[in-house]
Amino acid sequence: MTTPDGIVSALAVALARQSESHADCPLFNDPYAQVFIDAALSRGCQLPSDETSERINGIANYASSRTKWFDEYFIAAGAHGLEQMVIVAAGLDARAWRLPWVAGTTLFEIDHPGVLKFKNEALHEHGESPSVSRYVPVPADLSDGWSERLRDAGFDVSEPTAWAVEGLLPYVADGPHLLFDRIHEISPAGSRLAVEAVGTGVADWLSTQGWQVTVIGAQELMTRYGRCGDHSDTDAGMDTVFVNATRDR
């Protein structure tokens, strides 16, 4: 197994989750973050520099709060009867392995082919199996034909779906984007969508499309989880909001 290009940023977030897992009172437990770190090191990947590590530590409270919020979102979606989940740009978070999924759930993970290959090979070599009933990796470039590849992988466009868009701020910074057009097109009534976004543009657009939307700011979220930290965290989440939407029609 080789380490794919672009994996360093995903490893940086994995380092933040690994750190939170060892906190005195962690928001979540992610034993798989260390699996990815070890797999990357064993294949000659350089971990982030000291300067980058300092920046990671500086946004640790924000990153941990974000992870917790998306974890709770998926658990709530399952409790409300949704059995089809999609994570867009899943990165190296092993939610398919670490969350307590409802029996019968199918989880699709969309990401670049190299990232998914690295992720699944690392976990397989470590002897890990998904906790979700059906896990389906979908290798795709988000700029080209991802929704077609998702359908080809078995995605049911008639079934209400819980979507998550996390860590894609450059793509969703200015409101409606082709990504959300496509999600809207293949999401029937009863579907849910969780988005980490900059500003309220995404929330405003979803509201016009018939989604019921709630929004919480990053600072409020960190306070809720007892992770309201230093100035770096404050700067990181200054304009970030977390959007939770349900499609009624």
Curated annotation (Swiss-Prot):
Keyword Methyltransferase listed? yes
Q: Classify the source by domain of life.
A: Bacteria
Any Pfam family from its record, for instance, is: LCM
> From the Swiss-Prot or TrEMBL record, what is one GO molecular function term?
methyltransferase activity
The answer, when asked if Methyltransferase is one of the entry's keywords, is yes
Q: Which UniProt keywords apply?
A: Methyltransferase, S-adenosyl-L-methionine, Transferase
Annotated S-adenosyl-L-methionine binding lies at D111, D141, L142
- Reported EC number(s) for this entry are 2.1.1.-
GO BP annotations of the record are: methylation
Note the PANTHER family from the entry: S-ADENOSYL-L-METHIONINE-DEPENDENT METHYLTRANSFERASE YKTD-RELATED, S-ADENOSYL-L-METHIONINE-DEPENDENT METHYLTRANSFERASES SUPERFAMILY PROTEIN
Family (UniProt): Belongs to the UPF0677 family.
The task this protein performs is described as: Exhibits S-adenosyl-L-methionine-dependent methyltransferase activity.
Can you say what this protein is called? Answer: Putative S-adenosyl-L-methionine-dependent methyltransferase Mjls_0570
In which organism is this protein found? Mycobacterium sp. (strain JLS)
Tell me the lineage of the source organism: Bacteria, Bacillati, Actinomycetota, Actinomycetes, Mycobacteriales
